[in-house]
């Protein structure tokens, strides 16, 4: 029996609990009042759509600048926040997630084409949730909430009500350990090809 199986047997004898996304954290939107995105002389730095879409974990280096009205009225990002694409040309590219694992500077904002969730500490490890949000099971449930004809977007109320597994923290941490190892090995093998 694997360590993960032992933890599940010990800590979840009646099965893993499921909760709606809105129950496990605070959902927030990207910046508003943008007057000039990609402005070298902007008044704020932000995490852009491509950064979230392309990476399992956000790259916090060399972030672009934007100019926005009322920068003090914006949701400021923190380490542990999970970011999602809110719209795309295809349904499969909506709600692609990425987590901020690295220490992030104060005052960094979120692109207006993204939204995020801040997982409450009592519900666990943001990296676990990010791996789940990238899973095939979750992607299938997300696709049922996507709307559109030529441009597709995620329905926020439907997204917030999606049920996700919330195992105890030791189970989450073991899952993250396994998946981080797998991700690292995959990257090494890919680099050697």
Q: What residues fall within each predicted segment?
A:
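Accessory (non-catalytic) regions of SAM-dependent nucleic-acid methyltransferases
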Residues: 1-11, 82
């Amino acid at each position: 029996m694997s360590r993960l199986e032992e933890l599940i047997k010990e800590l979840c004898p009646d099965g893993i609990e499921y909760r709606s996304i809105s129950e496990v954290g605070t959902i927030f939107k990207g910046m508003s009042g943008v007057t000039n995105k990609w402005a070298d002389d902007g008044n704020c730095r932000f995490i852009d759509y491509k950064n979230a879409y392309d990476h399992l974990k956000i790259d916090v280096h060399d972030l672009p600048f934007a100019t926005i009205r009322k920068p003090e009225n914006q949701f400021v990002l923190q380490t542990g926040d999970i970011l999602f694409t809110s719209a795309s040309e295809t349904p499969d590219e909506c709600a692609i997630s990425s987590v901020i694992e690295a220490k992030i500077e104060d005052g960094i904002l979120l692109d207006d084409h993204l939204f995020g969730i801040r997982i409450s500490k009592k519900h666990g490890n943001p990296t676990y949730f990010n791996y789940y949000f990238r899973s095939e099971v979750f992607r299938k449930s997300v696709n049922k909430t996507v709307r559109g004809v030529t441009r597709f977007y995620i329905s926020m109320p439907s997204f917030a009500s999606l049920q996700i597994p919330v195992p105890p923290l030791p189970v989450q941490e073991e899952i993250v350990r396994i998946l981080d190892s797998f991700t690292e090995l995959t990257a090494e093998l890919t680099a050697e090809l």
